[in-house]
UniProtKB/Swiss-Prot annotation:
It comes from the Eukaryota. Belongs to the IER family. Residues 308-318 have a biased composition (Acidic residues). This is Immediate early response gene 5-like protein. Pfam families: IER (PF05760). Residues 86-107, 160-231, 308-327 are annotated as: Disordered. Residues 195-231 have a biased composition (Low complexity). Residues 177-194 have a biased composition (Pro residues). Disulfide bonds: none annotated. It comes from Homo sapiens. InterPro entries: IER (IPR008653). PANTHER family: IMMEDIATE EARLY RESPONSE GENE.
């Protein structure tokens, strides 16, 4: 979902377009539909993410109520190095539960798809945990070479291939001259030169800038970070930012519609977001810096109203009779001042908020006011899996669509 732009600035731009397109045919309806579709799409995605988290909690409760032998089957999917929290995220049970949604065919199919995605995720984790085995063998070989020599490598499960042949010289033995035949394994590399002696050559290897001992720990620490999304209970909810992320003072938001002017406005804590951003103490708007929507309000286009052509003709006739000053046209400053008076304001007055009517109800405000968890991760699932199940209990969204 494309959420690169700030939601508040996008809504302010849409409101300004709605206000400036009153003279166009179908302009108000076009921009209003675009704004409403954007708000409803964000609300729907947030609602679906909440449904994902609820389904995950129900599945965890069903797994806790099962006998212990079923839980041992779930733990068999986990890799030896995986944390216990990732192992608890077992395969989803498709039948036998007391939930009414699990007995429906659509819900059963959706849970089956979630089960397949979970198995793919576990296979990727197994592959990631089995891949860095040679690095661990190299570290074990470096530690066990002084004590046990080549015998220490044979005890490790995945290090049999790295054991040198019987005829290969060890580290303490002198090297023999080169002879034609099978070449032995290369000896361990000596410690690298210090950073001062390292030439600044782009063709130099990467090991010159960093010691070889620093690269394997950094690379070995990166694969265990992948099971983190499965360990958090609400990792289905992290993909879609909510309007509550834009600041603590903007937590309570209400989207309202003026039935007289057909203008949709976002009201926060009893005042407009534009008035809040105009102050220098606003924490979520860049310390009072004007956004992209406010920058466009600097230049106002010339608005024509009924009877304007006749007034301009009268003024031109009156200007032709008098003496023309050397600066230019005589009545140009007066016309410009009169046109600025009819330029619409970029933000409506705060006194008109009482005349605005809420269209989304308590359901929308209850969803957007929730604060997400700090440990959320983007979900690997598609948002269309539980669409039918989530849209079956929609109440506030249908009222919002009917209102338009």
């Amino acid at each position: 979902m494309e959420c690169a732009l700030d939601a508040q600035s996008l809504i302010s731009i849409s409101l300004r377009k709605i206000h400036s397109s009153r003279t166009q045919r179908g302009g108000i309806k076009l921009h209003k539909n675009l704004l409403v579709s954007y708000v409803l799409r964000n609300a729907r995605q947030l609602y679906l993410s909440e449904r994902y988290a609820e389904l995950y909690r129900r599945q965890q409760q069903q797994q806790q109520q099962q006998p212990p032998h079923h839980q041992h089957q779930h733990l068999a999917y986990a890799a030896p190095g995986m944390p216990a929290s990732a192992a608890d995220f077992g395969p989803l049970q498709l039948g036998g539960g007391g939930d009414a949604e699990a007995r429906e065919p659509a819900a059963r199919h959706q849970l089956h798809q979630l089960h397949q995605l979970h198995q793919l995720h576990l296979q990727q984790q197994l592959h990631q945990h089995q891949h860095p085995a040679p690095r661990g063998c190299a570290a074990a070989a470096a530690a066990g070479a002084p004590a046990g020599g080549a015998g220490a490598l044979s005890e490790l499960p995945g290090c049999a291939a790295l054991q040198p042949p019987h005829g290969a010289p060890h580290r303490g033995q002198p090297l023999e001259p080169l002879q034609p035949g099978p070449a032995p394994l290369p000896l361990p590399l000596p410690p690298p030169a210090p950073a001062a002696l390292c030439p600044r050559d782009p063709r130099a290897p990467a090991a010159c800038s960093a010691p070889p001992g620093a690269a394997p720990p950094a690379a070995a620490a990166s694969p265990p970070a992948s099971p983190a999304p499965a360990s958090s209970p609400g990792f289905y909810r992290g993909a879609y930012p909510t309007p509550s992320d834009f600041g603590l003072h903007c937590s309570s938001q209400t989207t309202v519609l003026d039935l007289d002017t057909h203008v949709v406005t976002t009201v926060e804590n009893g005042y407009l977001h534009q008035d809040c951003c105009a102050s220098a103490h606003c924490p979520c708007c860049g310390q009072g810096a004007p956004g992209p929507g406010l920058a466009s309000a600097a230049g106002c286009k010339r608005k024509y109203y009924p009877g304007q052509e006749e007034e301009e003709d009268d003024e031109e006739d009156a200007g032709g009779l008098g003496a023309e000053p050397p600066g230019g046209a005589p009545f140009a400053p007066c016309k410009r001042a009169r046109f600025e008076d009819f330029c619409p304001d970029s933000s409506p007055d705060a006194s008109n908020i009482s005349n605005l009517i809420s269209i989304f109800g308590s359901g929308f405000s209850g969803l957007v006011s929730r604060q997400p968890d700090s440990s959320e991760q983007p979900p690997p699932l598609n948002g269309q899996l539980c669409a039918k199940q989530a849209l079956a209990s929609l109440g506030a969204w249908t009222r919002a669509i009917v209102a338009f």
